[in-house]
């Protein structure tokens, strides 16, 4: 048995099989028949708290942390990580405390920040968003309390027995829970590419913790298979515990729902300033108890069990309090997102933020909240300021102002958008998802507008919001081309000295036009920086280096030719190209730091691309960059260049780097390594980077922004050039200005004025020409030869024929215009192409307008028209 532990044996725990779900569990109550899961025996703690006193969230957090900090084996307290995990690219949000240490620590690459550790990690899980406010227990954000240990072959900390012992001691010694009320349910665990056995901890039906014993990692070649996925043993064993802070607080208060236990002050504020009011505690407690036993949740079933189906007055009250619950929950989640400067948008984590905001706006409308969402943020922040560390009100106010306008515009356009997607008096689930995703129209508004338009109810599945969240939380990592190369461990000379442009190496591997050396000064493509070019000298011949790529520890050179293995060769890096790329790379870091200083701390690097002539930097920013912004940023960059700021590069141990520089380190990605190569420009920017850099900002020489644009909501692109490339760009602009000056016959400062003048004159001239054309066409049409009641014949030249044709298109009748070598036909009877085909084999056009090569007189045309009318 996986959990035949000394702790269980010495305390006389018994292992039983649940009479309801058949799972195995451990208990001190030998008469117990159920595992403690609410689906098996429901809640019994509401109004009967087993905890000796009531805690609030701050008190419970402190109680937990101090218990482990002051233990005989002291646990190191670790400050919470951000909720946006910029140290990994496979998830959008931190769902649990272990996310902080995947994959670097759990893979064995990096050491943990302490061992053992204790922390309280804010986490966001959006999958249950449909259930928030309904079940009494679901939240989109929560704090996961944890005490974790990382066990290595040469450093054992603690494993299953000690972990269970800790959980039991905390519950019984600190919270004074009756030991007979605690059950440990056996259950396998999977998450984030790892797996292991686990115990779920229940008290009176409430799951208060999960104790995970992680020792497996996903491995397609692994020898262990669990639920269709293959695993292999990890290089270390990790104790990953998760105690729900809010659940423990709820257990201590025994309130009807979790919301009253953790959001009491915020809820009171909302109820005081809205139409919402508390529903009877007895009824809310009953709803929570029934909801705990139902999986999947059904609102209809819950309401039928409390005998409230069809009670409109009660349903309005219930709907209002649920909206208030949703408001406080969403406000805390949004504040956590905003503390990490998430900008609402239609993609990735921004999509989830906008979803929460628009649901919040809708809740406020339903309960007629007398105030703004900022007021709610203030109230919630007052309750949770110990965990929401960054409350940037200016940033939040700007975001809310923009999002409120977008929400109003969405409401204005919603009816027409929804109307277009109605087919046979319904809207398919696919189109509902499209309306929500593309236009951001909440499901409730889709339902309301649909009913207004069709007088019918729209059937939207209860968990549809969960389906939408899954679509956006499913992060697809870019597939990397995997090639089979030997692990040569090429020594990179470009890090030791970026000035090395010549070197000697030995060919360790050769296959066609690909070679791997023992060492190289050629920088491989990576971090948005293109590969170096140059050549090798072999047997007196120059062999061009076309590309350089890194696969694992091997640096592969793609060459224009072949060089046999074991050859000793000399390499020459294209110095001009490398220097320009170094300038653009260092300039990118400078520009990012300046943009953050200028716009605010919400600026993060979204993506970059460096090149020879120009580079681009995409940053997070919620407004379009103006001309004034560009000038100010350029001036600030110039000041930094002229100030000769030093650029430092150093390798720092993973945890120390995070401690010293924070999570800005991961703006350009993250290394799968135990160290981070940190590039710092004095007091301007620090980030992890594997690229080549200058030693001082003065070597950037100059920086010029070429263009800016909004590439998607919340993302601004800056295209810029620096160094010699900036000089070439300026010279090109000067050449263009010089040509314009010559052409316009004005000095440079008058070019804009003269250009505007010419454009206006051109517009006026076009208007005049159009007027003259219309008058001339009218004269020809008026004097046209009438062939019959419907048809007219006009003789003209080629240029005038096209003008006349333009003004006959909107008239009734057939107009045949002869130029002498070509005939144009305009017909409101949709037979222009037929007439053209009868006049000539060489014709083209449509039913309305056609053209053919011929010189037919009016008599021939009369004959053809007679035939057509038959």
UniProtKB/Swiss-Prot annotation:
Binding residues for Zn(2+)? 585, 589, 689, 693
Catalysed reactions, semicolon-separated: tRNA(Ala) + L-alanine + ATP = L-alanyl-tRNA(Ala) + AMP + diphosphate
An example Gene Ontology cellular component term from the record?
cytoplasm
Where does the protein end up?
Answer: Cytoplasm
Cite the SMART domains for this sequence. Answer: tRNA_SAD (SM00863)
Alphabetically, which GO biological process terms does the record hold?
A: alanyl-tRNA aminoacylation
As one GO molecular function, the record gives: alanine-tRNA ligase activity
Q: What is its EC number?
A: 6.1.1.7
Domain characteristics, as noted in the entry: Consists of three domains; the N-terminal catalytic domain, the editing domain and the C-terminal C-Ala domain. The editing domain removes incorrectly charged amino acids, while the C-Ala domain, along with tRNA(Ala), serves as a bridge to cooperatively bring together the editing and aminoacylation centers thus stimulating deacylation of misacylated tRNAs.
The similarity comment for this entry is: Belongs to the class-II aminoacyl-tRNA synthetase family.
Q: Which PANTHER family match?
A: ALANINE--TRNA LIGASE, CYTOPLASMIC (PTHR11777:SF9), ALANYL-TRNA SYNTHETASE (PTHR11777)
Supply the NCBIfam families for this chain. Answer: A-tRNA_syn_arch, alaS
What does this chain do? Catalyzes the attachment of alanine to tRNA(Ala) in a two-step reaction: alanine is first activated by ATP to form Ala-AMP and then transferred to the acceptor end of tRNA(Ala). Also edits incorrectly charged Ser-tRNA(Ala) and Gly-tRNA(Ala) via its editing domain.
Protein name per UniProt: Alanine--tRNA ligase
Protein source organism = Picrophilus torridus (strain ATCC 700027 / DSM 9790 / JCM 10055 / NBRC 100828 / KAW 2/3)
Q: What is the lineage of its organism?
A: Archaea, Methanobacteriati, Thermoplasmatota, Thermoplasmata, Thermoplasmatales
């Amino acid at each position: 048995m996986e959990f035949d532990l000394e702790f269980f044996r010495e305390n006389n725990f018994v292992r039983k099989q649940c009479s309801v779900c058949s799972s195995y569990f451990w208990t001190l109550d030998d008469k117990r028949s159920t595992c403690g899961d609410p689906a098996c025996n429901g809640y019994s703690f509401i109004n009967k708290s087993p905890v000796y006193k009531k805690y609030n969230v701050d008190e419970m957090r402190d109680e937990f942390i101090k218990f482990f900090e002051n233990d005989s084996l002291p646990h190191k307290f670790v400050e919470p990580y951000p909720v946006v995990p910029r140290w990994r690219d496979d998830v959008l949000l931190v769902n649990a405390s272990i996310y902080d240490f995947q994959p670097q620590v759990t893979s064995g690459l990096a050491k943990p920040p302490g061992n053992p550790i204790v922390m309280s990690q804010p986490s966001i899980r959006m999958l249950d968003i449909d259930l928030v406010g309904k079940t009494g227990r679901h939240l989109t954000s929560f704090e996961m309390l944890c005490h974790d240990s990382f066990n290595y072959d040469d450093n054992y900390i603690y494993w299953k027995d000690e972990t269970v012992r800790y959980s039991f001691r905390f519950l019984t010694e600190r919270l004074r829970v009756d030991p007979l009320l605690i059950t440990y349910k056996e259950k396998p665990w999977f998450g984030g590419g790892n797996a292991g056995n686990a115990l779920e901890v229940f008290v009176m039906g409430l799951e208060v913790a999960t104790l995970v014993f992680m020792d497996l990692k996903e491995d397609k070649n692994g020898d262990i298979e669990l639920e269709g996925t293959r695993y292999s043993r990890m290089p270390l064993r990790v104790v990953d515990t998760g105690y729900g802070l809010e659940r423990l607080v709820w257990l201590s208060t025994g309130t009807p729902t979790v919301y009253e236990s953790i959001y009491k002050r915020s809820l009171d504020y909302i109820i005081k300033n809205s139409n919402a009011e508390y529903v009877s505690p007895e009824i809310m407690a009953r709803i929570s108890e029934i909801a705990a036993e139902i999986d999947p949740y059904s609102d209809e079933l819950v309401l039928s069990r409390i005998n409230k189906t069809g009670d409109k007055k009660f349903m309005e009250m219930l709907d209002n309090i649920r909206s208030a619950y949703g408001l406080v929950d969403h406000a805390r989640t949004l504040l956590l997102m905003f503390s990490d400067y998430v900008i609402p948008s239609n993609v990735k984590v921004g999509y989830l933020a906008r979803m929460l905001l628009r649901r919040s706006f809708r809740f406020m409308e339903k309960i007629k909240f007398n105030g703004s969402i900022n007021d709610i943020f203030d109230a919630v922040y007052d309750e949770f300021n110990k965990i929401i560390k960054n409350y940037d009100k200016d940033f939040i106010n700007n975001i809310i102002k923009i999002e409120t306008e977008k929400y109003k515009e969405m409401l204005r356009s919603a009816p027409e958008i929804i109307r277009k997607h109605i087919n046979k008096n319904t809207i398919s689930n696919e189109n509902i998802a499209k309306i929500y995703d593309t236009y951001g129209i909440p499901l409730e508004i889709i339902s309301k507008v649909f009913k207004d338009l069709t007088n019918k109810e729209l059937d939207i599945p209860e968990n549809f919001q969960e389906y939408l969240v899954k679509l956006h939380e499913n992060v697809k990592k870019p597939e990397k081309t995997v090639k089979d190369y030997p692990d040569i461990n090429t020594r990179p000379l470009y890090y030791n000295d970026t000035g090395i442009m010549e070197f000697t190496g030995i060919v360790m591997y050769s296959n066609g036009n690909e070679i791997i050396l023992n060492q190289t000064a050629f920088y491989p493509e990576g971090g948005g920086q293109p590969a170096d070019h140059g050549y090798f000298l072999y047997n007196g011949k120059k062999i061009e280096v076309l590309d350089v790529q890194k696969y694992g520890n091997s640096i592969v050179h793609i060459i224009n030719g072949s060089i046999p293995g074991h050859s000793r060769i000399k390499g020459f890096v294209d110095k001009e190209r490398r220097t320009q790329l170094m300038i653009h790379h260092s300039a990118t870091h400078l520009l990012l730091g300046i943009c953050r200083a200028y716009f605010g701390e919400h600026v993060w690097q979204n993506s970059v691309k460096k090149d020879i002539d120009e580079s681009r930097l995409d940053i997070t920013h919620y407004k379009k960059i103006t001309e004034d912004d560009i000038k100010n940023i350029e001036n600030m960059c110039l000041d930094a260049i002229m100030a000769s700021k030093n650029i430092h590069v150093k390798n720092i141990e993973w945890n120390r780097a995070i401690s010293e520089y924070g999570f800005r380190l991961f703006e350009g990605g993250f290394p799968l390594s135990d160290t981070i190569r940190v590039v710092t420009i004095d007091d301007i920017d620090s980030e992890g980077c594997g690229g080549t850099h200058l030693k001082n900002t003065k070597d950037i020489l100059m920086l010029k922004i070429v263009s800016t644009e909004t590439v998607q909501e919340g993302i601004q692109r800056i295209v810029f050039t620096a160094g010699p490339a900036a000089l070439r760009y300026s010279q090109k602009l000067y050449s263009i200005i010089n040509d314009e000056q010559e052409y316009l016959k004005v000095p440079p400062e008058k070019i804009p004025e003269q250009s505007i003048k010419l454009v206006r004159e051109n517009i006026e001239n076009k208007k005049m020409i159009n007027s003259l054309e219309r008058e001339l066409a009218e004269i020809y049409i008026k004097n046209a030869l009438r062939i019959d009641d419907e048809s007219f014949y006009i003789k003209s030249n080629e240029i005038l024929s096209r003008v006349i044709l333009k003004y006959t298109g909107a008239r009734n009748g057939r107009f045949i215009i002869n130029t002498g070598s070509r005939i144009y036909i305009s017909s409101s009877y949709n037979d222009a192409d037929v007439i053209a085909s009868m006049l000539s084999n060489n014709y083209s056009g449509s039913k309305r307008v056609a053209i053919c090569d011929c010189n037919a007189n009016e008599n021939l045309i009369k004959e053809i028209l007679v035939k057509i009318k038959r």
